[in-house]
């Protein structure tokens, strides 16, 4: 068996959270799903308050997981583009379910924004 697969949690929900379990990864997934291929700075602008280091780290993690494809063009200055792989595109129903749930939550009387995490 593949050693990477052996390290995944037995629970499929936990496996999914391991792969896209932080807010930055979900926002990267959202933007690449909505926009298609994007350059690093476009992605950074689209997400908003994400540092270059955090974006780089999360893109590498998602690339290693097979969710994001990184293409480097031999140009001066260098150009790098990111897009979703087929596996990344297969997460679109998960994103859509999150969108629907979020919209429904915002319609609830007394809906509260989440507390800021320390």
State each model region's role:
Residues 1-7, 46, 103-118:
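HhH-family (HhH-GPD) DNA N-glycosylase catalytic core used in base-excision repair
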Residues 7-54, 81:
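N-terminal helix-turn-helix DNA-binding core of bacterial DNA-binding proteins
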Residues 30, 65, 94-108:
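Alpha-helical linker/hinge and terminal dimerization helices associated
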Residues 41-73, 77:
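Canonical helix-turn-helix DNA-binding module
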Residues 47, 59, 88-95, 102:
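Short amphipathic alpha-helical/adjacent loop interface patches that line ligand
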Residues 69, 86-87, 92-93, 108-118:
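A basic, often C-terminal nucleic-acid-binding module that engages the phosphate backbone, implemented
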Residues 74-98:
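Basic, amphipathic "hinge/linker" alpha-helix immediately C-terminal to the N-terminal HTH DNA-binding motif
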């Amino acid at each position: 068996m593949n050693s990477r697969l052996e390290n995944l949690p037995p629970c499929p929900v936990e496996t999914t959270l391991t792969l896209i379990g932080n807010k930055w990864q979900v926002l990267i997934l959202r933007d690449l799903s909505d926009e298609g291929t994007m350059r690093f700075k476009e992605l950074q602008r689209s997400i908003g308050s994400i540092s270059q280091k955090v974006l780089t780290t999360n893109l590498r993690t998602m690339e290693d997981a097979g969710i994001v494809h990184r293409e480097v063009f031999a140009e001066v200055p260098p150009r790098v583009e990111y897009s979703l792989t087929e596996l990344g595109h297969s997460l679109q129903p998960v994103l859509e379910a999150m969108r629907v749930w979020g919209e429904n939550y915002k319609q609830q009387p007394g809906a509260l924004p989440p507390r800021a995490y320390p």
